[in-house]
Regions:
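Hydrophobic anchor at the beta1->P-loop junction of P-loop NTPases
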Residues: 6
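The conserved Walker
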Residues: 10
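Conserved lysine of the Walker
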Residues: 14
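Hydrophobic positions on the alpha1 helix immediately C-terminal to the Walker A/P-loop
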Residues: 17
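Active-site signature of alpha/beta-hydrolase-fold catalytic machinery across serine-
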Residues: 20
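Conserved substrate/cofactor phosphate-moiety recognition/catalytic segment
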Residues: 23-76
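Glycine-rich phosphate-binding loop used to anchor ATP phosphates in small-molecule kinases
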Residues: 67-130
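A glycine- and Lys/Arg-enriched "phosphate-lid" helix/loop adjacent to the NTP-binding pocket
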Residues: 104, 108-171, 175-184, 201
């Protein structure tokens, strides 16, 4: 089993990086005689599948039931983990991980007994899913603000919350040793990701 994931604060280039590495990782998989699956971005998919009929936007959902959304994401990552376990010869490339769910669960917070249950359930699911991730590539902030693309909620523009978000992600490398903190340069990131995956597939 080989599961490689991109993680990091909003607006740090994960989606761009995923697009940039698609072709070289596909070629790399062929070189190693493996198939590769680029898993769908969970944030938008989960919102549209489970919440879009009741909420106009993610921002509306986060104002009403932020941990309900994070719980749905944790459940989706758990499903991904089970899929990876059943297909050990496939290389999985994931946009975000359970680490991201943990960060945003803490960042968004909650109140009341129902949210306490959701938090317990979220971390139970993450415990079951994170152990299948072989390596995390962590994107660092570029020093700017997160791009507003019509999906990211407004609280990402709050400087205090933004600083807290970035601080939380900076500790992932301490908590999970199989982490590579990526450089800022676009080409350098591609080279680091492809090179590291190539070496890990030989292990």
């Amino acid at each position: 089993m080989s599961v490689f994931a991109f993680s990091g604060a909003a607006g740090t280039g994960k989606s761009t990086l995923l697009s940039d590495v698609t072709a070289p990782i596909t070629a790399l998989a062929e070189k190693h005689g493996r198939k590769v699956v680029f898993q769908e971005e969970r944030a938008r998919k989960v919102f549209h599948e489970k919440f879009s009929s009741d909420y106009r936007s993610l921002e509306d959902l986060l104002q009403t039931d932020p941990l309900g959304y994070q719980l749905a994401l944790a459940e989706a990552f758990s499903v991904d983990a089970q899929q990876a376990l059943r297909n050990p010869h496939i290389i999985y490339i994931a946009d975000r991980t359970g680490f991201d769910v943990a960060v945003y669960s803490m960042l968004l917070g909650g109140k009341g007994e129902s949210d306490a249950y959701k938090i317990r359930r979220i971390f139970d699911l993450l415990h079951n899913s994170l152990h299948v991730v072989d390596h995390v590539f962590l994107t660092q902030p570029f020093g700017g603000t997160a791009e507003r693309d019509g999906f990211r909620p407004a609280h990402y523009e709050d400087p205090a919350k933004r600083a807290l978000e970035e601080s939380m992600f900076s500790h992932i490398g301490v908590l999970f040793p199989n982490t590579t903190v990526l450089p800022d340069g676009r080409q350098e990131r591609v080279q680091v990701v492809v090179g590291r995956i190539d070496r890990l597939l030989y292990i």
